[in-house]
From Swiss-Prot:
InterPro entries: NA-bd_OB-fold (IPR012340), RNA-binding_domain_S1_IF1 (IPR006196), TIF_eIF-1A (IPR001253), TIF_eIF-1A_CS (IPR018104). Pfam families: eIF-1a (PF01176). Keywords: Initiation factor, Protein biosynthesis. The lineage of its organism: Archaea, Methanobacteriati, Methanobacteriota, Stenosarchaea group, Methanomicrobia. Seems to be required for maximal rate of protein biosynthesis. Enhances ribosome dissociation into subunits and stabilizes the binding of the initiator Met-tRNA(I) to 40 S ribosomal subunits. It comes from the Archaea. Coiled coil: none annotated. Belongs to the eIF-1A family. It comes from Methanococcoides burtonii (strain DSM 6242 / NBRC 107633 / OCM 468 / ACE-M). This is Translation initiation factor 1A. One of its GO terms (molecular function) is translation initiation factor activity.
Length: 106
């Protein structure tokens, strides 16, 4: 008999990847890896364009999106300061595997 887990899906069942959000170049979005947590809402990011940026997690996403070191995220660099960026999306493990298979991650 299956254990009652409060109406939530089991953590062991990985959902099948149906569609993965990819970075949109027209919106100036870039893939990045979280290299360090700085505290508060700030992280250090190693971006796919070779630049190390300081990222900020917006307050609307802070509680919903728990970011750890090594996570793959989508960022948008600031218009007026290229060394800083906003974190707008975090990928799950199956989505990261899909990105690696399709060649988005190097």
């Amino acid at each position: 008999m299956k254990k009652n887990n409060g109406g939530r899906g089991s953590k062991t069942d990985a959902p099948a990847v149906t569609r993965v959000r990819t970075p949109r170049r027209e919106n100036n979005e870039i893939l990045a890896t979280v290299s360090a947590l700085l505290g508060g809402k700030r992280v250090t990011l190693q971006c796919m364009d070779g630049i190390v940026r300081m990222g900020r997690i917006p307050g609307s996403k802070k509680k919903r999106m728990w970011v750890r070191e090594g996570d793959i995220v989508i960022i948008t660099p600031w218009d007026f300061q290229d060394s800083k960026a906003e974190v707008i999306w975090k990928y799950t493990r199956p989505q990261v595997e899909w990105l690696e298979r399709k060649g988005f991650l190097k």
